[in-house]
A protein has these predicted regions:
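Conserved beta-strand in the GNAT
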Residues: 43-51, 58-61
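A short beta-loop-alpha structural element at the N-terminal edge
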Residues: 5-18
Length: 120
């Protein structure tokens, strides 16, 4: 990944088959309808499933191809989600505490059983 730029964009209907194939290979939900995908050199390497709520954007799932884990892909995906949340005028990203250690490293804090990160 060094020297390569991760291309992140919203998931579109035309991506559903690729997202399903990615989930079959790397885990995660095969039925993501709302979220972001990350590509390196045209290859799908990450899928972030999300739900937009009243004041927040919820991270439902974040899957990175195993060979690219711990290479900042997850961090980039969450930063792009924060940018999108700000455009949607949402104040918080929230996520399950399942991956609390990683989420703390990327700016989340635990509050009342969920991980939260202020947007903006």
């Amino acid at each position: 990944m060094k020297g390569q730029k991760l291309f992140v964009r919203p998931i579109e209907a035309s991506d559903f088959d690729a997202v399903r194939a990615f989930a079959a290979q790397h885990g995660g939900s095969p039925d993501v309808r709302s979220g972001l995908l990350g590509k390196l050199v045209g290859e799908l390497v990450s899928v972030l499933a999300m739900e937009v709520e009243a004041d927040t954007v919820r991270v439902v799932d974040l899957v990175v191809a195993e060979e690219l884990r711990r290479k900042r892909v997850g961090r980039v995906m969450l930063n792009e989600l924060a940018t999108l949340a700000a455009k949607l005028e949402r104040n918080w990203l929230i996520a399950d505490v399942k991956h609390a250690e990683f989420l703390r490293r990327v700016g989340f804090t635990e509050d009342q059983g969920v991980m939260k990160r202020r947007v903006g």
